[in-house]
């Protein structure tokens, strides 16, 4: 049975844990905060294959855990990078995260690189407060070779289910190639840049 590891990344308050809990339980949690590391596990059947899924939200760790983000990027088979469409700063953070992942995966094959990152604009139900146009998200995803979704964890269970199912499928296809190669360790300068991006975050919603 294959183990698939997916990291869910993004700024504080963009709805990372809400998306995960919605996927796992169908329930929507409007406010969520944790001072401890959160790893969610689920057994799935994808294309008649049994998979053990681990969903990791490193943003739920305490402040001193942010230095492990570099390790999480190497650890994961797939990435869900989330921003809030009503918060432009969260979009800029998501853009920085995507670029960091790409820098660390320069040696990846194009197929694996294309399928591993999903850029998700959350809180579509707040479109009346929109600060990030859908076209901006699509443009970033296209330029960075990401899959793109814009949805609402509060209102769109089926879209959340589809998004997670698709990234698990894509990550499972890429994980065999990943096992055959040794990823290079992140540089100190890259780790410092990650810390600069995430230095002010404390809790995840």
UniProtKB/Swiss-Prot annotation:
Its Enzyme Commission number(s) read 3.6.5.2
Q: Which Gene3D superfamilies match?
A: P-loop containing nucleotide triphosphate hydrolases
Annotated residues for binding of GTP? 10-17, 57-63, 122-125
Enzyme type, top EC level: hydrolase
Small GTPase-like as annotated region, ranges: 1-205
State the Gene Ontology terms under molecular function. Answer: G protein activity; GTP binding
Could you tell me which InterPro entries the record lists for this protein? P-loop_NTPase, Ras-related_GTPase, Small_GTPase
Reaction equations catalysed: GTP + H2O = GDP + phosphate + H(+)
Q: Which family does it belong to?
A: Belongs to the small GTPase superfamily. Ras family.
**This protein's UniProt keywords:** GTP-binding, Hydrolase, Nucleotide-binding
Task: Name the SMART domains for this protein.
Answer: RAB, RAS
Which superkingdom is the protein from? Eukaryota
Q: What does this protein do?
A: Binds GDP/GTP and may possess intrinsic GTPase activity.
Gene name in the database record? rergl
The name of this protein is: Ras-related and estrogen-regulated growth inhibitor-like protein
- Sorted alphabetically, which Pfam families does this protein's record hold? Ras
């Amino acid at each position: 049975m294959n183990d698939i590891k997916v990291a869910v990344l993004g700024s504080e308050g963009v709805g990372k844990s809400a998306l995960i809990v919605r996927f796992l339980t169908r329930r929507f949690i409007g406010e969520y905060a944790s001072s401890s590391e959160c790893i969610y596990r689920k057994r799935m059947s994808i294309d008649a294959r049994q998979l053990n899924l681990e969903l990791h939200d490193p943003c739920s760790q305490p402040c001193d855990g942010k230095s492990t983000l570099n390790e999480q990027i190497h650890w994961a088979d797939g990435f869900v990078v989330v921003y809030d469409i009503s918060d432009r700063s969260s979009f800029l953070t998501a853009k920085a995260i995507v670029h960091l992942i790409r820098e660390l995966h320069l040696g990846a094959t194009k197929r694996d690189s294309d399928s591993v990152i999903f850029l998700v604009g959350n809180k579509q139900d707040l479109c009346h407060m929109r600060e990030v146009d859908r076209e901006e998200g699509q443009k970033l995803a296209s330029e960075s070779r990401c899959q793109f979704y814009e949805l609402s964890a509060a209102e769109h269970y089926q879209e959340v289910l589809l998004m997670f199912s698709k990234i698990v499928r894509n990550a499972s296809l890429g994980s065999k190639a990943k096992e055959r190669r040794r990823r290079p360790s992140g540089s100190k300068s890259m780790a410092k840049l990650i810390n600069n991006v995430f230095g002010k975050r404390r809790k995840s919603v």
